Amino acid sequence: MKISLFGYGKTTRAIAENLVDKFGSFDIYDDHFVETKKDTLGNLLLNPNDFDNNLSDIEIPSPGFPPKHKLIQKAKNLQSEYDFFYDIMPKSVWISGTNGKTTTTQMATHLLSHIGAVMGGNVGTPLAELNPYEKLWILETSSFTLHYTHKAKPEIYALLPISPDHLSWHGSFDNYVQDKLSVLKRMNECDVTILPKIYANTPTKAHIISYKDEKDLAAKFSIDMEKISFKSPFLLDAIMALAIEKILLDTLSYELLNSFVMEKNKLEEIKDSQNRLWVNDTKATNESAVMAALNRYKDKKIHLIIGGDDKGVDLSNLFDFMKGFDIELYAIGISTEKMLDYAKKANLKAYKCEVLSKAVNEISNHLRVNEVALLSPACASLDQFNSYAERGKVFKECVNKI
């Protein structure tokens, strides 16, 4: 069997490295490969122009591989890593949505690790590196993965709220939503899906539990919100994790949940040498994540760093939302001029900074002790950084130099 891998990313590298003994060498295609070479395992590294769909039995793309790429268009036997590993996949919980996927996945794993739950997918470990003999896989599942998945399904599908994101990749918000909901048509009567009430009528054989907001979801599972130490925007994530535990074990482990430690880069608070508050929310790459961050600090004047790769999303609603805050903006990245234009139309004060270090220095000239400086950019980072994590790291380094 000849397996072709599209893109030389974390997912496809894990497949090539972990399954070479079972399948022999793989053909790996990536735009960065100019000439044909072999890696240390004997896999062929090929330019996409060399792909012959008549010589390939299965094609597996990296999750974020563009659907309009010529390799995708030529593929005859395309499947996601979820489909590829479905036959050996144990019982699984898939967690998706626009914001909160990672936190909910981590919280649910924290609650269920004692029964043999392991975490993977879009966060942490690729499926090729997960142990199929574990009792439960909890998978953070992106819209990219769902787009390419046509066979696999979970026993529990937990869907957090959906808002516009990755529109340049999906083509439209409707396409994005449909990819998020696509798994429902493969689920059966023994499966459960938790999803926002707006999607409650989506055709599926699964048992649907819909919710309007945190309070509604908590009520559906008899969860006492007063016993949860996490506040918005992480409250819904915590309730969803408890709901998953309730379905599987019929228990609610509040104390264990409250012992969970949040990861970096999500509303990560730091103080500078003058005891002023700076918040690293670099992972906020869409408008709903930024809105959640703004609501968290609504009682303070906010100095917001915004901009980067906007992924083709119209952010007009976000800037209209900002009108209700005491806020000044600091525009960075490839979308600097676009951010300034949004700000002008919304009558919001904005500074042209272009790069993160300049934005931090500009804020430092204005920031008072009772105010907050917030990096919550509403955009991806790849225009100027290797990842959102690197952007957060640079932000903290700049703050520490003040």
From Swiss-Prot:
Keyword Protein biosynthesis on entry: no
Chief location bin: cytoplasm
GO molecular function, one term: UDP-N-acetylmuramoylalanine-D-glutamate ligase activity
InterPro entries: Mur-like_cat_sf, Mur_ligase_C_dom_sf, Mur_ligase_cen, MurD
One Gene Ontology term, aspect cellular component: cytoplasm
Entry superkingdom: Bacteria
Gene3D superfamilies: Mur ligase, C-terminal domain (3.90.190.20), Mur-like, catalytic domain (3.40.1190.10)
Residues annotated to bind ATP: 97-103
EC number(s) from the headed UniProt entry: 6.3.2.9
Gene Ontology terms: biological process: cell division; cell wall organization; peptidoglycan biosynthetic process; regulation of cell shape
Cellular location(s): Cytoplasm
Catalytic reaction list: UDP-N-acetyl-alpha-D-muramoyl-L-alanine + D-glutamate + ATP = UDP-N-acetyl-alpha-D-muramoyl-L-alanyl-D-glutamate + ADP + phosphate + H(+)
Coiled coil: none
Swiss-Prot/TrEMBL keywords: ATP-binding, Cell cycle, Cell division, Cell shape, Cell wall biogenesis/degradation, Cytoplasm, Ligase, Nucleotide-binding, Peptidoglycan synthesis
Pathway connected to this protein: Cell wall biogenesis; peptidoglycan biosynthesis
HAMAP family, A to Z: MurD
PANTHER family linked to this entry: UDP-N-ACETYLMURAMOYLALANINE--D-GLUTAMATE LIGASE
Similarity field: Belongs to the MurCDEF family.
Biological role: Cell wall formation. Catalyzes the addition of glutamate to the nucleotide precursor UDP-N-acetylmuramoyl-L-alanine (UMA).
Designated name of the protein: UDP-N-acetylmuramoylalanine--D-glutamate ligase
